[in-house]
Amino acid sequence: MEDTFLFTSESVNEGHPDKLCDQISDAVLDACLEQDPDSKVACETCTKTNMVMVFGEITTKGNIDYEKIVRDTCRDIGFTSEDVGLDADHCKVLVNIEQQSPDIAQGVHGHFTKRPEEIGAGDQGHMFGYATDETPELMPLSHVLATKLGARLTEVRKNGTCPWLRPDGKTQVTVEYRNDHGAMIPVRVHTVLISTQHDETVTNDEIAADLKEHVIKPVIPEQYLDEKTIFHLNPSGRFVIGGPHGDAGLTGRKIIIDTYGGWGAHGGGAFSGKDPTKVDRSGAYVARQAAKSIVASELARRCIVQVSYAIGVPEPLSVFVDTYGTGKIPDKEILKIVKENFDFRPGLITINLGLKRGGYRYLKTAAYGHFGRDDPDFTWEVVKPLELEKPAA
């Protein structure tokens, strides 16, 4: 028997209270950037029964209707009555937004006087980017499957295939892997877990049958399922009360779901509600582009990149690369290639990845993952052709 191991990733869908908060924070960011691309945004959201509050620091020339953004976002997700967990049109909306601290503003941007390469990081911190050749997206399979199951739950709820579904839900996938000299080879799906909110009318048997037919079958490739695959479908029994009525929600509570499903590493900084001067977001995006480009160019089968910053300082303090023993050339050579091909200064990341553009851009990232998505707005997913040093003749 070959040596294998199990690894698990989870996801939540857009009606989960924490994810609702992420989406509201990013909808606010989108609105600010659309009206004023130089907006400085640090927008947090929290929610509980019948209440949503947005709070934080925002400096923008835009005229932002925060309450409308909150209600529209909740409504689009499907929170249209107290039965489903929140009533977008009648819930309490509290707004407590202040301007960015002038101390931070002068240290970071003096943004009207400084050239882009002089803009300092908005805070200290360290961020990671990760890539692996186990899927076409160059993302971990356990994470990809958990995420796609969550997205599919929402799809069949909104298109009427499973009318008994309600917005809140969670998924989790355990994959059996083989380690091939540092590269990850998925062998099979060991366990699939789905807990979804539903209305009172549906039976547990109907839930299980519909989830297998309309959610699991279309998402998980047949080659990974066998007679030993375990399914836990709403294992707690009933899940009628959900959304903010079931649990309180908070922006930035789902950072592993947003990234790599427990693979790679995480510096701890959340993404949603933050403009691109916040390196928690822009640093993690460029680190993903670097790691993905290394794997896509077949310099390694698996790669992690770390970058770190000091507040007010444009140049990163450190850049680190590890290819888990899968590199075609030594890691120190790959590190050199990364440093020569990617500019980690926040002002330049923002320009190179076009991060000042709002619209529906960031709202899309706030559910179903920031990485491995096939969408032109996810500019950090574009593989950069790497210029390699030609050895001297």
Swiss-Prot record:
Its EC number is 2.5.1.6. Disulfide bonds: none annotated. It comes from the Eukaryota. One of its GO terms (cellular component) is cytoplasm. Keywords: ATP-binding, Cobalt, Cytoplasm, Magnesium, Metal-binding, Nucleotide-binding, One-carbon metabolism, Potassium, Transferase. It is an enzyme of class 2 (transferase). Pathway: Amino-acid biosynthesis; S-adenosyl-L-methionine biosynthesis; S-adenosyl-L-methionine from L-methionine: step 1/1. It catalyses: L-methionine + ATP + H2O = S-adenosyl-L-methionine + phosphate + diphosphate. GO terms for biological process: one-carbon metabolic process; S-adenosylmethionine biosynthetic process. InterPro entries: ADOMET_SYNTHASE_CS, S-AdoMet_synt_C, S-AdoMet_synt_central, S-AdoMet_synt_N, S-AdoMet_synthetase, S-AdoMet_synthetase_sfam. Mg(2+) binds at E10. L-methionine binds at E57, Q100, D247, K278. Binds 2 divalent ions per subunit. The metal ions interact primarily with the substrate. Can utilize magnesium, manganese or cobalt (in vitro). Homotetramer. Belongs to the AdoMet synthase family. NCBIfam families: metK. This is S-adenosylmethionine synthase. It comes from Musa acuminata (Banana). The lineage of its organism: Eukaryota, Viridiplantae, Streptophyta, Embryophyta, Tracheophyta.
